[in-house]
Amino acid sequence: MEHAAVASAAVVLNIPVITSMVLRNLPAKSLNACSRVCKTWNMIAKTVKQRRKSMSCFFVGYEEGEILDGLAAVIMSTVQDLMIEPSVLFMYCTSQLYEQQLTLPTRHHMRHPRASKCMLSSVGDLVRKVLPKKCKLLAASSDGIVGTSKDLKKTTEVEGELALSCLFLPHVEDVEFFTFNVDIYSYANQMDETHSGLTYLTGLSTVPSDKDVKAVFFFCDEPFCPPEIGYTLLQMYDNAVIAGGYVDNLITSDPNPHDDASESGSASLMCVALCGPQVKVRSVVIKEDIHTPEEVERVLKQLKDCNLPEERSYAFMFACLGRGKGHYGCENVESSVFRKMFPKTPLLGFFGNGEIGFNFLQKYQNEAPDTTCDNFQSNPTHGNSVRSARILEGMKKPLPKLYHAYTTIICMVSVV
């Protein structure tokens, strides 16, 4: 009887329609295992994975004094259970967590001290190990972070405690991320010699000249950073949003192609260029004189009026350490207002030592330039590139104020 049941299951799973229904409910990692069973299963698994285009977010926080023994297992199971095969992971952790050693789960009791030591890992090393090899890890640590629960019902701001925030993005056709790292000291030397860092940055950029750059995310782990870098990026990538801030540490899985260092943790500045014709990026600055939830809502209303499709969007919040609870007198003010106004859009970010960004608020329907774009003019006649003629054109335009203190930058990305 038992053998008959097993045989029946084998027969049933040879029916493509039923196999497809079963595989549709499996996470991506299990789908990859099933794809090796036979040619039919391989084709079905491939089709199922191609149809999955939704992003996934993850947040975990620990109060002071809580034990971290289970965090490594939580991270590993989160990646294991992802329905998508992630192409990019944006991750922010508090510096308190970055400095911790996590205990890795094991079935065996380690008696030898050396073996026990091998079962410890930093959060950055652990995530590198469990991510698919093709997934880009773009991460940083700071004194505070912002994260959204998997069900999108709650966004939390954490300052001075242990917390981790992740956003897993699937591969989308024609949407690409290019990273390049900048040694700000080499840049400063170049400025001293030539009074221009344009040639230096152009040589470092990994973005092909024919790509349509919609945003450059800018993360620096040094308090000293020549402001000319940000403005040069604006000139290189005309009509692209520049957004980011100053963090404590950079974490990435990508080797630096222009440096002997194998990890960008040794670099001073990490730039992430987001490209794609169907990508729309908008940003808004919550200035230092905003003190109430009602005022925050009025500012975010400008972002809401851009009419980006919320369910196909994600957003970043780059805030000053001086904001948050200390500024408003209560927790989660800005993130709660965002959650109220954009209930279908995940939000993540950090509290840093300085913010980078500007108002870029074109409406989505017609892409017409809006007067709220901080004097930043668009030129719809051609795409972004680093070609000399294009850069010279960008240098003639008035540039917005890019560097801020005691503000919050909200940057929203949509794939339409």
What are these regions (language model features)?
Residues 2-315, 320-416:
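Cofactor- and metal-binding active-site motifs of prokaryotic enzymes
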